[in-house]
């Protein structure tokens, strides 16, 4: 009887210990799920270990994953991330774009600059004079493509243009990102387009504007030899991304019945369509989202206003009503006389300093220059170029000053 009681007691003790262990493991798993369940899972790409990561050098940056010396102490979700790719003669254009972003931005802004090696020192010199800006820091990165296929990617459309396709794989610690071309000008705070991330539904991973509003002058619907998104395709010059979702998603495609992740789909797409695409990386993005339309959020044309919206007559209704939010001077219109209205806005911001008085005083001279362009199609509606700009300056600079 005594032996029986000992056995029962031993079993009860073992059972109690097992119960305690089970509860402790459950608590640990719940903690991990809450703290780390949403960490980005990027595709494993071997070339990243050989230079795909940014150097992070330059004034105002302490490298990827570390805060720069001009960075305010903020939670990660408070900081906005902007990326640009600059090659060739794009230094001045890029600096002007960055200036337009900083003039109106409210939240801290971290800029990821991907540039050819010979441009790095020039960027550091130009941006060093902005070190007084408490809400701005940046990182410089080399132009990097996957090893065996680097030559194919470099000659796709324009030099370096396809670098943007690899941003989700290179910037693995960045959750969300706004990519813009160098020929972009912000006429309202970056914060406003950044806020569109909150409008994504559960399936959407990126946002772009339509390539055309009017199908009769559309390029994709008339000439494309590959799939494209929607009625007229999308333009990738302004692209807002939830990169965590992009890295996790398995994409439908027309190459295999299996769904592929971002790091696995790019090269097969290029191999299949490289003889049929005209606009390089933008065409590849159109192909991806043509098969995954539920993943794209489409914002109105005023967020990516181009010469095509006015050279054939005004065809961006939202810009007519509220003004241009983001100006996209593609086709080199900032640097020739074909579209003087676009060039006037670019020159005004290029010559503007980051001092408050300089920003306040740019409107009147700009309006006078725009009035000289009324003989052109885009100049006929010149007021849409300054409608939102006027509001942005008033809201940012005619209110009590805040630390910038």
Curated annotation (Swiss-Prot):
Transmembrane region(s): 7-29
Class of the enzyme per the UniProt entry, highest EC level: transferase
GO biological process, one term: O-glycan processing
Membrane-topology annotation of the record: Single-pass type II membrane protein
Glycosylation sites: 201
InterPro entries in UniProt: Glyco_trans_8 (IPR002495), Glycosyltransferase_8 (IPR051993), Nucleotide-diphossugar_trans (IPR029044)
Lumenal side: 30-404
Pfam families from the UniProt entry: Glyco_transf_8 (PF01501)
Compartment list: Membrane
Function: Glycosyltransferase which elongates the O-linked glucose attached to EGF-like repeats in the extracellular domain of Notch proteins by catalyzing the addition of xylose.
Protein name: Glucoside xylosyltransferase 1
Gene: Gxylt1
């Amino acid at each position: 009887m005594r032996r029986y009681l000992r056995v029962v007691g031993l079993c009860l003790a073992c059972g109690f210990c097992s119960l305690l262990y089970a509860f402790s493991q459950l608590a640990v798993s719940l903690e991990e799920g809450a703290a780390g369940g949403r960490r980005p899972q990027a595709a494993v790409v071997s070339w990243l270990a050989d230079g795909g990561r940014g150097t992070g050098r330059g004034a105002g940056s302490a490298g990827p994953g570390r805060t720069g010396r001009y960075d305010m102490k903020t939670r990660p979700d408070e900081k906005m991330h902007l990326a640009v790719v600059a090659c060739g003669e794009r230094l001045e254009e890029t600096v002007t774009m960055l200036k337009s972003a900083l003039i109106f931005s409210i939240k801290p802004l971290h800029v990821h600059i991907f540039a050819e090696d010979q441009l790095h020192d020039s960027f550091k010199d130009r941006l060093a004079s902005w070190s007084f800006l408490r809400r701005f820091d940046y990182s410089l990165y080399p132009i990097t493509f996957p090893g065996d296929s680097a030559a194919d990617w470099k000659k796709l459309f324009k030099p370096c243009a396809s670098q943007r396709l690899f941003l989700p794989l290179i910037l693995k610690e960045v959750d969300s990102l706004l990519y813009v071309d160098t020929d972009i000008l912000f006429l309202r705070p970056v914060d406003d387009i950044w806020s569109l991330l909150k409008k994504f539904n559960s399936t959407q991973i990126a946002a772009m504007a339509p390539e055309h509003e009017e199908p009769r002058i559309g390029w994709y619907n008339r000439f494309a030899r590959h799939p494209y998104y929607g009625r007229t395709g999308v333009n990738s010059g302004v692209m807002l991304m939830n990169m965590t979702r992009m890295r996790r998603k398995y994409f439908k495609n027309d190459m295999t019945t299996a769904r592929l992740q971002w790091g696995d789909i790019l090269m097969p797409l290029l191999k299949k369509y490289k003889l049929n695409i005209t606009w390089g990386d933008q065409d590849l993005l159109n192909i991806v989202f043509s098969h995954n339309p539920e993943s794209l959020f489409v914002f109105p044309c005023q967020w990516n206003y181009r010469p095509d919206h006015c050279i054939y007559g005004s065809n961006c209704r939202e810009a007519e009503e509220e003004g241009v939010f983001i100006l996209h001077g593609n086709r080199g219109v900032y640097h020739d006389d074909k579209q003087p209205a676009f060039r006037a806005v670019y020159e005004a911001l290029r010559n503007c300093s980051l001092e408050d008085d300089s920003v306040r005083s740019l409107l009147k001279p700009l309006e006078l220059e725009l009035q000289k362009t009324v003989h052109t199609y885009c100049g006929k509606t010149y007021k849409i170029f300054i409608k939102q700009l006027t509001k942005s300056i008033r809201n940012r600079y005619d209110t009590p000053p805040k630390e910038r």
